[in-house]
Amino acid sequence: MVKRNHKYQSGEGAQYMTRKAAMRKLQLSMQDFRRLCILKGIYPREPKHRVIAQRGSTDIKILYHRKDITFLLHEPIVWTLRDRKIFNRRIAHARAKGNNLLKNVRMANYPEIKLDHIIKERFPTFIDAIKELDDCMTLLFLFSTFPAMKVVTREITSLARRLTIEFMHYVIAAKALRKVFVSIKGYYFQAEIKGELVTWIVPHYYPFQPQRKEYVDFKIMKSFADFFTVMAGFVNYRLYNSINMVYPPQFSVSIDSDESRNNEETFVSERIAALNMDLLRSDRQGTEEEDEEIDLKLLDNDKDSEQVRKMHEEALSLSKLKNLFKGLKFFINREVPREPLVFIIRCFGGKVSWDKHLFVGSTFDETDESITHQIVDRPSLTKQYISRDYVQPQWIFDSVNQRKLLPTNKYFIGAVLPPHLSPFNRDDAIYVPPEEAAMQAGDEFEKQERAEGISDDEDEDFGMEEARKQVQLDYALVKAFREEKAEALNSGEAKKEQAEEDNEDDDQEPDQDETKKQRSEKKQKMAVVSGRVFKENPKEQKQLTKQEEALRAKMVKSRHKKLYRNLLDKQKKATKEANLLREKRQQIDKQKRKEQTQKRKAQRKEILA
């Protein structure tokens, strides 16, 4: 007898499992199940046919893949979570009895969760871990600003603070920072680590405001923080070893003072948090710079292909960016946020200091005459030095994004700042702000000038050889032209003699043949005719594009039509948003022009009065 196939025993109905069934199978509570899924990187799935996956149920339920749940059954953490549940019950029992000794024993023997094997499992290679650093560093920088709470303890916040400071020191030592941006959310930083771009956000330092549980669940965030702290420890250790730096970070110069002798660990941690001192290396520092110089020399030898030329230009701009603030000394006023600016300036080779009474780690005072720039964020200053420029903090960010030192006249104290443009815009963006378009045009003009300057230098070096080659080519061309002309004249004379003999034989030819010959001779002669501009009809062009799009849509396969429609909808949405931005910009410009005209009229009235 043939075996009967029961409903939902195969196919999509057997592939998925509800969250309740998964918790029953793993014998875990809701909190432990969530924590286990976060640590293992398992998320709910969306089936193609939800009713079949839910075995006929029309309610929307959270579904997991059955293979993921069976994968969790072999996880050692499941046993630790079950042991924790038993320990929690015993601790509550001892607390209810008032037996503090037994409770302390239970707390001391409380089972700990080890995540080392999960890190190795989720990130088989070091590059895989670097690709996940975006979320890791963003969350750790957020946790480093939290105060001590019931769920987020002081240990977690201090550990997050230490790991983020270590990561920032690596970026400073490797000069890996590429882009910076300030927004309402915080400070955006992008670094290039092992060829991968890592972008993270550092929040603004505002007082902490407690949030409701419906909006923010700190227990779930704590599970992510536990995983990311272990991951960041592994990554920092590998990164420090890759550039031959001692881990955990230590100073290259021993600091002997009364404060350091009394509490050495606290003093060293404060100095490291200052981000203003070089850390200890296991070998000399000039190895990376020498390697970069060798790479640039290799690229200089071969500039024939366009790809190599682009790589050479990018390498040159990158080498200039790494030493953008080299030789400059900055002083930060007390109203300016210290940490992000110190981090940026140190990444690009600058020296920075601040008021020594404000925070530990300052290297020079405000009265130092060698200071080149002072960063101020107030409308006026009582005392100013002639030997330095007083700029607002935006000058630092814009200079880094433009990869050059911008003029400081637009960033003086009290000046209306230019718009702070985002460096994370894509090349295929539909809407480009006019300021950014002007800056791009200026960069292209500078590149052309640089290319012309390079060509002039090459002409100076190899000018004699190229001139000789050009003279030889010109002489060969002139010689060939003269030979061709002589051959043409000889052939023309022979043709004329033959034609005269034919005319003598046939004297009675009509005059029409002569006119035809004259016309043919005129046609054979070269003539330059002025061209006419062809005007395209925009309506016809639009109609043609629509017809082409319709034909293109017909050629799409039936299984890809949904994807094609989604792409078209996305493109339409992007164009609509770009048009809205253009309209808003036009309104703003119109309002500004109106205000300027009103100011001029008011000034004229005052002058006339």
Curated annotation (Swiss-Prot):
Feature: compositional bias, Acidic residues: 499-512
Q: Where is the composition biased (Basic residues)?
A: 554-564
Claim: Ribosomal protein is one of the keywords in the record: no
| Keywords, comma-separated and alphabetical | Coiled coil, Nucleus, Ribosome biogenesis, rRNA processing
The main place the protein resides is: nucleus
- Annotated coiled-coil positions are 481-509, 539-607
Q: Which InterPro entries match?
A: BRCT_dom (IPR001357), BRCT_dom_sf (IPR036420), PES (IPR010613)
Kindly list the cysteine pairs connected by disulfide bridges: none
Q: Which residues form the BRCT domain?
A: 320-413
The GO terms this record gives for MF are: ribonucleoprotein complex binding; RNA binding
Comp. bias intervals (Basic and acidic residues): 444-453, 488-498, 513-524, 533-552, 567-609
Alphabetical list of Gene3D superfamilies matching this protein = BRCT domain (3.40.50.10190)
Reading the lineage from the top rank, the first entry is: Eukaryota
GO cellular component, alphabetical, reads: nucleoplasm; PeBoW complex; preribosome, large subunit precursor
Q: Where in the cell is it found?
A: Nucleus, Nucleolus; Nucleus, Nucleoplasm
| GO annotation, biological process | maturation of 5.8S rRNA from tricistronic rRNA transcript (SSU-rRNA, 5.8S rRNA, LSU-rRNA); maturation of LSU-rRNA from tricistronic rRNA transcript (SSU-rRNA, 5.8S rRNA, LSU-rRNA)
Q: Where is this region: Disordered?
A: 443-462, 488-609
Q: Which family does it belong to?
A: Belongs to the pescadillo family.
Function of the protein: Required for maturation of ribosomal RNAs and formation of the large ribosomal subunit.
Q: Entry's PANTHER family?
A: PESCADILLO - RELATED (PTHR12221), PESCADILLO HOMOLOG (PTHR12221:SF6)
What protein does this entry describe?
Pescadillo homolog
